[in-house]
C-alpha cells in the first residue's frame, strides 16, 4: 500500500516528543479503530543517558541469529517496533491495529501532525535524552533523512 492509498484519521507529530508516550497513545488509538500516521519519527526522543540508550539498542541489534529476532535500525522501524510492543500483535485485533499504523521519517502528509497531550519533551525534568536519528546512526543505518 503506497502513501497515496493510506488515508489517516489521525496524524501525530513525534517531533520533540517522548517515543514511548507517543507509541502508547498511538497503540491505544489503533486498537480503538483509528488509522494513525506518525510523522517526523527521526526527531522523537528516548530518555536516558546517551551511553545507556546506545548500549540497549546496540545489544538488541547484535542479538539474534539468522532466524531472529530482528531489530530495526531506521528510526521509523524502531518507532513501529515500539508500537508493536504495546499491541497484542499475535491476535487478530492487534494485527489489524498494527496494520492501521504508519510511521514516516519526515512529513510526507499534506497536513501538519498533532502533538499529543503529555508526550512533549517539556515535561522532562532532565536534559538527558537521545533522538531516534542519533540511535539509528549509532546502529549503522543509512542516513537518508
Swiss-Prot record:
Name of the gene encoding the protein in the UniProt record: rpl13
Family designation: Belongs to the universal ribosomal protein uL13 family.
GO molecular function, one term: structural constituent of ribosome
Annotated Gene Ontology cellular component terms: cytosolic large ribosomal subunit; ribosome
Family matches, as PROSITE patterns: RIBOSOMAL_L13 (PS00783)
Subunit structure: Part of the 50S ribosomal subunit.
Name the record gives this protein: Large ribosomal subunit protein uL13
Coiled-coil intervals: none
Function: This protein is one of the early assembly proteins of the 50S ribosomal subunit, although it is not seen to bind rRNA by itself. It is important during the early stages of 50S assembly.
Top-rank taxon, per record: Archaea
Keywords of the record: Ribonucleoprotein, Ribosomal protein
Any one biological process term the GO annotation gives: negative regulation of translation
Presence of keyword Ribosomal protein: yes
Amino acid at each position: 500500500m503506497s502513501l497515496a492509498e493510506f488515508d489517516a484519521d489521525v496524524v501525530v507529530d513525534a517531533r520533540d516528543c517522548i517515543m514511548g508516550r507517543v507509541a502508547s497513545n498511538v497503540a491505544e488509538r489503533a486498537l480503538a479503530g483509528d488509522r494513525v500516521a506518525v510523522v517526523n519519527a527521526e526527531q522523537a526522543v528516548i530518555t536516558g543517558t546517551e551511553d545507556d540508550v546506545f548500549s540497549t539498542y546496540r545489544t538488541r541489534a547484535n542479538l539474534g541469529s539468522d532466524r531472529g529476532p530482528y531489530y530495526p535500525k531506521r528510526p521509523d522501524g524502531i518507532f513501529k517496533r515500539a508500537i508493536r510492543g504495546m499491541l497484542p500483535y499475535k491476535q487478530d485485533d492487534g494485527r489489524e491495529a498494527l496494520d492501521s499504523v504508519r510511521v514516516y521519517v519526515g512529513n510526507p502528509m499534506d497536513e501538519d501532525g498533532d502533538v499529543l497531550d503529555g508526550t512533549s519533551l517539556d515535561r522532562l525534568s532532565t536534559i538527558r535524552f537521545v533522538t531516534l536519528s542519533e540511535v539509528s546512526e549509532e546502529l549503522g543505518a543509512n542516513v537518508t533523512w
